[in-house]
Amino acid sequence: MKVRPSVKPICEKCKVIRRKGNVMVICENPKHKQKQG
């Protein structure tokens, strides 16, 4: 999980979602998981 000020999809499988007001990227590749904060 990377925590970044700006989250962007890295590959085609990355999805940008909102969970409890947090913007997150979820992906099949665990290295692509990101969280805003």
From Swiss-Prot:
Similarity-based family: Belongs to the bacterial ribosomal protein bL36 family.
Tagged with keyword Ribonucleoprotein: yes
Superkingdom of origin organism: Bacteria
CC per GO annotation: cytoplasm; ribonucleoprotein complex; ribosome
Any single biological process term in GO: translation
UniProt-listed PROSITE patterns: RIBOSOMAL_L36
Keywords carried by this UniProt record: Ribonucleoprotein, Ribosomal protein
The protein's name in its UniProt record: Large ribosomal subunit protein bL36
GO molecular function: structural constituent of ribosome
